[in-house]
Amino acid sequence: MTDPDCRLCRKAAGREAKLCYMGHATMENRHGLAVAGMVTLATGTAERRASETMLKAKVKKLGRRITVGEDKAYDTADHVTNLRAINVTPHVAQNDSITSAGKRRRSAIDGRTTRHQGYSISQSCRAMTECIFGWGKQHGTMRKTKHRGIAAVAVNFLLNLIAYNLIRIPKLVAA
């Protein structure tokens, strides 16, 4: 039985499209713990919109400017502008690759952001976010969910984030 809410999503060019939801997690750089997560329908802008939603809530809670490290899929002018509008400094990897038409893409992140030491630190910590998803697929229940409906899948996803944090905390205490 397939989930009627799922959408077809392709992870990369040349790959097959699969029915799925998209899980999004926010990780803090200092300890590597997941601090926010949500599940959305798979769309072309779901990652960026989820990022903006989670970061807006984080800024509101903290009451100060924060920085965020993101991969080059987030390097769009509208996303960078939206982040700056909600008091977030985007440390997004620059997407200046060459398109299929042979043109070089223009990054929305300029030298004013990339010259700071914090930018390189955010970029090195960014890779650790993938550990959350890797752990959830290998040890948790994120590889193939048995739940139907976005609410049930979201609960399962958040449970995996909590479990990841519980596994991670003893390693932090020992260090």
Residues covered by each model-derived region:
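A short, flexible helix-boundary coil/loop motif
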Residues: 139, 143, 170-175
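Polybasic low-complexity intrinsically disordered regions
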Residues: 1-86, 95, 156-159, 164, ...
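A generic membrane alpha-helix/interface feature
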Residues: 46-49, 54, 89, 105, ...
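Helix-centered, glycine/charged polyanion-binding patches within enzymatic domains
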Residues: 72-155
